[in-house]
Regions:
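Alpha-helical transmembrane segments and their immediate juxtamembrane cytosolic regions
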Residues: 1-237
C-alpha cells in the first residue's frame, strides 16, 4: 500500500473503534437512528484492512490466529447478548470472520505458489473455501466479510491496486452484503455501500504501528467490553 504521512496504525484503529462504537450504539440503543448505522459502515473495512496488513507482516501466523481465536471465543457471549440469548447458533461475531479470513489468506498464499494454471486454480479454491466457510458458519458479514479481507490483501500492491480495491468494495458492499436501505434519488440505496467511504481514510495510513505492541490487547478487549456496556445500558433503560 502506498505510503503517505498522515495516520499511523494506532490512530487509524482508534478511528475504527470509535466508528464501531457509534454503529453499535445505533444497533443496540437507538435502532431507529439510521445515521448512526450509516456512519458505522466505515468501521468494518478499516478493521479488515488491518487484518490483511497484520497477516502480511506477522512473524508468527500461528500466534496471530490463536490470539484472534481466543478473543473471538471471549467475545461470543457479549455478541450473542445483543440478540437476547447466551447462545445464538445462527450468528457468530466478527472476530470469527477474521479467523476464517486469516486461514483463507494462508491457503491462498500456499496454493498460488504452485506454478501455472494449477496455482491459479488453487488460489481460487482457497477463496471459494473461505467464502463457503463464512456462509456455513454464519459469521458476521458472512462469506463476503472473508472476501473483504482477501480483497484488501490482494490489492496491497500494484499499479491499479487502488482502482481494483475501490471497484471491489463497491461491488461487495453495494450488491453482495445485505443491509438496510434508505431512500435516495427515488430508489432504495443499501447503507452498506457507504463502507467504500472508508478507503480515503485507509489510504492515509503511513505504515507505522503508532502504539506499543501491548496496546493491541486493548483493541481486542474493547470489542467485547463495549458490547457488554451497551447491553447493560439497554437492560437498565
Amino acid at each position: 500500500m502506498e505510503q503517505s504521512k498522515e495516520l499511523d496504525g494506532g490512530t487509524l484503529k482508534l478511528i475504527a473503534a470509535a466508528l464501531m462504537l457509534i454503529d453499535h450504539v445505533g444497533a443496540i440503543l437507538l435502532p431507529e437512528t439510521v445515521i448512526l448505522r450509516c456512519i458505522g459502515r466505515l468501521a468494518f473495512p478499516i478493521f479488515a484492512f488491518f487484518i490483511a496488513e497484520g497477516y502480511a507482516h506477522t512473524r508468527s501466523f500461528g500466534r496471530y490466529l490463536l490470539r484472534m481465536a481466543i478473543w473471538a471465543a471471549v467475545s461470543e457471549i457479549p455478541f450473542n447478548l445483543e440478540f437476547g440469548h447466551f447462545f445464538v447458533p445462527g450468528r457468530q461475531n466478527v472476530l470469527w470472520t477474521f479467523c476464517l479470513a486469516l486461514l483463507t489468506l494462508r491457503g491462498l498464499d500456499r496454493l498460488r505458489r504452485v506454478p501455472g494454471n494449477i496455482g491459479y486454480a488453487g488460489a481460487a479454491l482457497a477463496l471459494a473455501a473461505g467464502f463457503a466457510a463464512g456462509e456455513l458458519l454464519h459469521v458476521d458479514y458472512g462469506g463476503w466479510g472473508v472476501m473483504t479481507v482477501a480483497l484488501f490483501y490482494l490489492c496491497r500492491e500494484g499499479r491499479y491496486a487502488r482502482c481494483g480495491l475501490l471497484l471491489g468494495m463497491l461491488v461487495l458492499n453495494g450488491l453482495c452484503i445485505s443491509s438496510r436501505t434508505v431512500p435516495a434519488f427515488g430508489i432504495a440505496v443499501p447503507i452498506q455501500i457507504l463502507a467504500a467511504a472508508a478507503l480515503p481514510v485507509i489510504w492515509l495510513y503511513n505504515g507505522r504501528p503508532g502504539v506499543n505492541r501491548r496496546w493491541r490487547w486493548a483493541f481486542y478487549a474493547f470489542y467485547p467490553a463495549h458490547l457488554l456496556v451497551l447491553e447493560g445500558i439497554q437492560a437498565l433503560t
